[in-house]
Amino acid sequence: MFEARLGQATILKKILDAIKDLLNEATFDCSDSGIQLQAMDNSHVSLVSLTLRSDGFDKFRCDRNLSMGMNLGSMAKILKCANNEDNVTMKAQDNADTVTIMFESANQEKVSDYEMKLMNLDQEHLGIPETDFSCVVRMPAMEFARICRDLAQFSESVVICCTKEGVKFSASGDVGTANIKLAQTGSVDKEEEAVIIEMQEPVTLTFACRYLNAFTKATPLSTQVQLSMCADVPLVVEYAIKDLGHIRYYLAPKIEDNET
Amino acid sequence: MSLKKALDDCMIDFDRCVLVTDLLEEYKLSYKEVNDVLEAYIKNQEPATKFEKRFLVHGKKKTQGSGAGEDLYSVVLESKLKDWLAKVQDAESQLYSVKIAGGTKSPAATFKPMQHLEVKLAKVEQRPGAGKLVPTANGVPATNGVKSEPSKSQGIKSEASKSSVKVEPSKSSLKTEKDADKPPVGKGKHSPESKKTSPKEQASKAKPAAAKKGSINSFFTAAASKPKDVKATPSKPAAGTMDNFFKKQPPGAQKSPTEKEKETKKAAPAPAKKEPSKKKSPSPTKKTSAANTSVQLFDEESAESSDEEEKLDKLRRKVIGSDNESDVEKPSTSKRRRISDSEDEEQPPKKATEQEVIAVDEEMDREPANETYLDEDGFVITQRKPVKAQPAKKKVSPKATAPASKKKSPPSAGKAGKDGSKTKQAGIMSFFSKK
C-alpha cells in the first residue's frame, strides 16, 4: 500500500508543471524514503531528477517499493481539477495498475478522487556520479528565468561563463549579441535576491536555450536556483522544494565540434 | 450535406445574396441540379417571402451594321430580364443569384465567379496573358480580383479543392470570367487539387527537413543509431554512449584534430577516413578541384595502400621530372593530362600525401565518372566521360557542399554555427552511466 498526502495541491501542480514540458511520461519510484523520479527527455539531452522526501509529506506510507509509470499530461489534467489549497492524497495498492488521486477541500466539505491508469515504462536509470563542480552559482530563480527567456531571442545557445568577477550569460545570433553579467551581490537584505558564486576555476560552457527555458518552468517552486558547472560535465540546475525535496535538471553541454 | 437538405434546414442565408456559383462550388452539383433545387425551394417559399433574383444574360450585342455582334454577359435583376432578353440577340438567361427582397442586409457580393470550376469552353479563345494574371501564393492561386468574404471563400476553396468539380454550366459568363483567371496551360487537367496539394507536400517536406536541422532530437538519434552519419564516424567511435565519454573525456586531454587524424589513419582503413577528411579540408580541395585532377589520380591510389602509394609517388616524380609543363595552361581542352602538382613542388611529397589523400577522397566523390589509366608512354590519362553535365555539377558542388556540409553536420551545430561557435549538442547519456 502506498499513500502520500500533501497539505497543498499547489506544490504538486507546480512540480508537474515543472516537468511535463520535458517529459511525457515518467516513473515515480516510491519507497519509504520518499518519491523519486528520474527521466531523460525524449532527445536524451537533459535529465530530470525529482526527489520528494517522505518527511515532507503530511502523511507518507509505502509498505513496498512501488514504481508508478504515469503519463504526466494526464496527471497534470487531474491536478488541474484541484484547488490550490486542497489536500492531495495519492494512493495505490501494491501491484496495482491504477493510482488514486484524491483532493479534499480545506474544510473537508468537498472530496474528489480521480483514478489514473498506470503505465509500464521501460525507462533507463542513469547513475549520476558525484562531481566537484568548478562553479556553483546561486541566483534568484526569477532572474535566471528572465535571462533564459531574453537570450533565447538571440540564439539557440547560451554561453555561460563563470569567473570570479561574476557569471556572464551570452548569446549571439542574427539579431546581434546579448551579454548579461551578474556580479556576486555584496550584501542583500533578502536572501532570495542574492547572487552567490562559489568558484574553484573559471568555466565557460554552452547550452541549448530551449532546455534552459524548459527548466525555468520550475521557477514557481523556489525563489533561488542553483547552477552547478564544470567543464565537459552536464550543467545542473537545481530548484529546492521547500521542506519537501528538490528538482534537478541535468543538461548536456554543447561541445566543440572538432570535425568541422 | 446536400443542397436540398441545407435549404430545408435553413442553412443558407438568403438575407445575403446567395450566388449560384457558390452553391455549385459548395455542393458540387451540376448547374441544372442546383438550379432545379433552388427554383423548387424558391417556389415553395415564394408566397411567404419575396425573393430578389438575378439572372445571368448571355447574348450578342445587336449592332447596326453586322448581324453578329460582340458577346455580352450581364447579371440583371429579374425585373429587367425581359428588357435585356429583348435587347440582346440570341439571348439566354440563367439564374445567378437569389436573396430575400427588401429589408436591410449586410453588404454581400453580388457577383463572384467560381473559384475552382472546370469548364470547357466551346468557342472562347484564351487570352494570351491570362495565365499571368493569376498571382500565386505558396502555390495556391490567389483570388481573382473579385472581392469576396475571405472566410467564406476560403472555405469554399478548400472544399472545392478536395474534389474536382466537373460541372459544365454551358456558355455562361462564369466561363469567361473564370477562364481569364485560369492559367492557359492547366485547362484540361490542371485541377485546383494539384495546386492545393503541392504546397502541402512542400510544407510537409520542408518540415522534416527543418526539424532535422534544428532539433537536437534528430541529431541525437542520428548520432546514436546511425553510424553512417558523417559526424559520428571515426574520431568518436561511440559519441552517444556514456562509457566512452567517461573513459576518454575525464582525462581532459582532448586531442587535437591532427592527432586525431593520425590516430584514425592508423586505426581505421582509408574508406572510413573519407568522410571526416572531407570536412576537415575544404581548402585543399578548392586548390585542386578545378583542373588538377591528375594529381588526385595518384592520391586516390595512394590512399588505398601504402605500397601502391610509394610506387605511384615514384611514378609521379618521374612524370614530373620528365615534363615541367604546367597543367594549368591547357587543362580544360586537352584530353590528355599530364601530371603536375604545384603543391608537390613546394612540399616534400610525403607530407603532401596527407593533404592529397584528403583531396582525393573528395575528388573521388566528385568525379567518379572519369577514367584514368597509364598510357604506353607512362603518362596518366584522365579521360572525361562524354557526360559533361556531371563533372560540371560536381565542380560546383565543392563550393556548395562546403557550407552545406557545415550546416548538415549536426543539426544543432548548424544553428550553432550562426552563433559563431561550432558546437554540437551532446547527449546526456554520454555523461552518465546506466544503472
From Swiss-Prot, chain A:
Keyword Nucleus part of the UniProt annotation: yes
Tissue occurrence: Expressed at high levels in adult ovary.
Subcellular location: Nucleus; Chromosome; Cytoplasm
Major location (coarse): nucleus
Effect of gene knockout: Mutant flies show temperature-sensitive lethality, hypersensitivity to DNA-damaging agents such as ionizing radiation and methyl methanesulfonate, suppression of position-effect variegation and female sterility.
Xref: CDD domains: PCNA
PROSITE patterns: PCNA_1, PCNA_2
Superkingdom of origin: Eukaryota
DNA-binding region residue numbers: 61-80
Entries under InterPro entries matching the protein: DNA_clamp_sf (IPR046938), Pr_cel_nuc_antig (IPR000730), Pr_cel_nuc_antig_C (IPR022649), Pr_cel_nuc_antig_CS (IPR022659), Pr_cel_nuc_antig_N (IPR022648)
Gene Ontology terms for molecular function: chromatin binding; DNA binding; DNA polymerase processivity factor activity
Disulfide bonds: none
Keywords associated with the record: Chromosome, Cytoplasm, DNA replication, DNA-binding, Nucleus
SUPFAM superfamilies associated with the record: DNA clamp (SSF55979)
Keyword Metal-binding: no
GO cellular component: chromatin; cytoplasm; nuclear replication fork; nucleus; PCNA complex
GO biological process: DNA damage response; DNA replication; DNA-templated DNA replication; eggshell chorion gene amplification; leading strand elongation; mismatch repair; mitotic spindle organization; nucleotide-excision repair
Stretches of the chain forming a coiled coil according to its record: none
Known function: Likely to be an auxiliary protein of DNA polymerase delta complex and is probably involved in the control of DNA replication and repair by increasing the polymerase's processibility.
Assembly and binders: Homotrimer. Forms a complex with activator 1 heteropentamer in the presence of ATP. Interacts with E2f. Interacts with the catalytic subunits of two DNA polymerase complexes: PolD1 from the delta complex and PolE1/DNApol-epsilon255 from the epsilon complex.
Similarity comment text for this entry: Belongs to the PCNA family.
Protein name: Proliferating cell nuclear antigen
The species this protein was found in: Drosophila melanogaster (Fruit fly)
